[in-house]
Curated annotation (Swiss-Prot):
Homology family: Belongs to the PINc/VapC protein family.
Protein name according to UniProt: Ribonuclease VapC11
Gene: vapC11
Pfam families: PIN (PF01850)
Biological function: Toxic component of a type II toxin-antitoxin (TA) system. Acts as an RNase. Upon expression in E.coli and M.smegmatis inhibits translation, cell growth and colony formation. Its toxic effects on cell growth and colony formation are neutralized by coexpression with cognate antitoxin VapB11; the effect on translation has not been tested but is probably also neutralized.
Length: 134
């Protein structure tokens, strides 16, 4: 499975032409069946909708992908552990939400496609499979 982080989705939605946007477009055309969503990413994507039409379009996208479910008893604690491990290693993770997304990806064996330095840090200190397009 492939999780596309909000950082890469935003590049795609804005049609920036960045390497992240190009990779998301490639994944959607060549590996669509492998793309999954998770609620933390859905929350970030949907919170960026400025109008109802955009929100409706984004809801269709989010709801049209298989979802990697959050297991509260496992994933939130794993996210806290990732955050603490980064701090112990002298690394900075700016978003605890990225730790939660990483915990989900690790548990589900999914690869994260991103444009976010947090996932580079997390991949260095865990077994997160991450493809950076920064």
């Amino acid at each position: 499975m492939i999780l596309i982080d909000t950082s890469a989705w935003v590049e795609y939605f804005r049609a920036t032409g960045s390497i992240a946007a190009v990779e998301v477009r490639r994944l959607l055309s060549e590996e669509a069946a492998r793309i999954a969503m998770c609620e933390p990413i859905a929350m970030e994507i949907l919170s960026g909708a400025l109008d109802d039409n955009t929100h409706t379009t984004l809801e269709r996208l989010v709801n049209g992908l298989p979802s990697l479910n959050v297991d509260d008893a496992i994933d939130f604690r794993a996210a806290a552990g990732i955050y603490r491990a980064a701090r112990r290693a002298g690394e900075t993770v700016r978003s605890i939400n990225d730790c939660l997304i990483a915990a989900l990806a690790i548990r589900h064996g999914a690869r994260i496609v991103h444009r976010d330095a947090d996932f580079d840090v997390i991949a260095r200190i865990t077994n997160l499979q991450a493809a950076s397009f920064r």
